[in-house]
């Protein structure tokens, strides 16, 4: 039978990890560092869905602070979590509004890798455009959008 792993305080490890991910998303929504040092390892590897990659916590903090001077995350909604060993996948919907008027929104997932003490040592985001369509709707020859 499956036995839920718990930490020394009796809190399920899955719940603790979900709480950490929610805190990270909340930091973006509130534009406030509420514990970046507490949730990421010093040598974290963070990869955004569109290629930027940050190879330590200091750079993640700089990116967080600098990005929030240019825009605001208005929605970062968690849809579901999946857990396996030292990894978690979280599915989400994201929307931001930049100071220049640009608005971005997309669906995504993050693959999170944890240390033994439940700090994030790697996080890789994957994004999916919400403007989907069927290229075969009108014919057997695909009609792709530009």
What are these regions (language model features)?
Residues 7, 41, 48, 98, ...:
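Acidic surface patches and DE-rich sequence motifs
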Residues 2-34, 38, 42, 141-146:
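Short, low-complexity N-terminal intrinsically disordered segments enriched in polar/charged residues
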Residues 2, 30, 46, 54, ...:
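Sequence-level detector for tyrosine residue identity
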Residues 24-27, 47, 96:
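Alpha-helix C-capping/helix-to-loop hinge sites
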Residues 1-2, 27, 37, 85, ...:
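Generic secretory/membrane-interface signal
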Residues 15-16, 20, 33-86:
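A solvent-exposed, acidic/Ser-Thr-rich amphipathic alpha-helical stretch
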Residues 10-13, 62-146:
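A beta-strand edge to alpha-helix "cap/lid" segment located at domain peripheries
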């Amino acid at each position: 039978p499956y036995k839920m792993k718990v930490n020394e305080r009796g809190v399920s490890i899955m719940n603790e990890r979900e709480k950490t991910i929610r805190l990270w998303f909340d930091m973006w929504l509130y534009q406030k560092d509420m514990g970046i040092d507490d949730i990421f390892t010093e040598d974290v590897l963070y990869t955004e869905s569109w290629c930027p990659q940050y190879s330590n916590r200091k750079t993640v903090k700089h990116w967080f602070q600098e990005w929030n001077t240019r825009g605001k995350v208005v929605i970062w909604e968690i849809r579901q979590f999946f857990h396996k060993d030292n990894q978690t996948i979280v599915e989400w919907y994201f929307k931001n509004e930049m100071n220049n008027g640009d608005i971005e929104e997309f669906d995504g997932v993050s693959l999170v890798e944890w240390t033994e003490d439940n700090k994030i040592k790697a996080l890789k985001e994957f994004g999916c455009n919400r403007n989907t369509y069927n290229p075969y709707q009108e014919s057997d020859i695909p009609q792709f959008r530009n």
